[in-house]
Amino acid sequence: DCRHNSNTLAKVVADVFFFFCIHVYLFSDMRPTPELSFALNYLNCHAGIVLTASHNPPEYNGYKVYWQDGGQLVPPQDKEIIQVIEALNYSEIKFEANENLIEYIDVAIDEAFAKSTVENASFNTPTAAKENLKIVYTSLHGTSIKAIPGVLAKAGYTDVNIVPEQEVPNGDFPTVKSPNPEEPEA
């Protein structure tokens, strides 16, 4: 996501997987978590990782693991993975940043995600109503800006107004007290 150093951390995580001979698909830039969940199934992956602190304050970052069904890792698999991580000898891992081993998945997944979202969502609004419906959208400086406008356009919504002050992804969330849309301060 747009948190500080997420792109750098993504490359480090990729290096660890390369060391263990695990194929890596990677977005070259931030994407919203639901797009990762979609990509797991679409690409027939076993697991995926999102580097995010969700709606926590800007000084945080995190590491969330998603299983092949697109959902977050849950017990007992989470504890099993933690045991494997704790047993690692980190000095053996070579961080060589081999870009040739990364398979970037940007546009193909973006398009498939938007198409699937429109096909599977309840966009039963008649075309004329879509053209007359005014939508105001904010990503609260987050990654959803990478997907939502395209999904709405693909669904036929033409009058989408993006809040310009909060359009650019920014891990400091400069115009909001909280990046959590569930909180009134947001």
Where are these regions (language model features)?
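Gly/Ser/Thr-enriched, mixed-charge loops and adjacent short helices
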Residues: 61-185
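N-terminal small/polar loop signature for handling phosphorylated ligands or for N-terminal nucleophile
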Residues: 1-60, 154-186
